[in-house]
Amino acid sequence: MMKKLFLFLMLMTAMVVNAQTKNAVQEVRDYLHECGVFYIATVDGDQPRVRPFGVAEVLNGKLYIQTGKKKKVFKQMMANPKFEITAVKPSGTEWIRISGKLVNDDSREAKAYVLDKNPELKSMYSADDDNTAVLYITAGVAQFCSFSAPMKEIKF
């Protein structure tokens, strides 16, 4: 009986943690969408590189970004998957910082989902081409910052 109760409690805890993670990922995605453009920092040898991005989508509880495999930024992400993202809300007084590691997802499902959510990219990318790259964040930490409120941090 105790073993069944223990297993039940473990299952419930896992479900709560999973739900919290999904909510955190969605919160980060919504914030990025509100900002519009976000900037991702990578490393090229010993030189930092920063570029504007605009695609952030949630699939299967993971936050995805999109780029092209032929781009230098993709090669940098594969050589060193650690990154930082920052974005500022239109007010200019609130911003987000995100760090973690990026994992390439070559599945057609992920590519198609991200492209379907961002149809303007379909003139340059396809779920079936060898160039489209969608990457998801692992070990993500998001810091929501403001000039007038304490920083809030969530992990996803």
What are the language-model segments listed below?
Residues 1-21:
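Bacterial Sec-dependent N-terminal signal peptides
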Residues 21-30:
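Short, basic/aromatic recognition patches
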Residues 30-45, 83-87:
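A short, Trp-centered hydrophobic/proline-enriched beta-strand micro-motif
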Residues 44, 69, 89, 102, ...:
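A mature extracytoplasmic/lumenal domain signature
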Residues 54-57, 102:
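Short, exposed beta-strand/loop patches in secreted or surface proteins that constitute
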Residues 56-91:
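A short mixed-secondary-structure module that forms the rim of ligand-binding clefts
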Residues 79-83, 94-103:
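Active-site-adjacent structural patch at catalytic or cofactor/ligand-binding sites
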Residues 97-156:
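Charged, gly/pro-rich active-site loop segments
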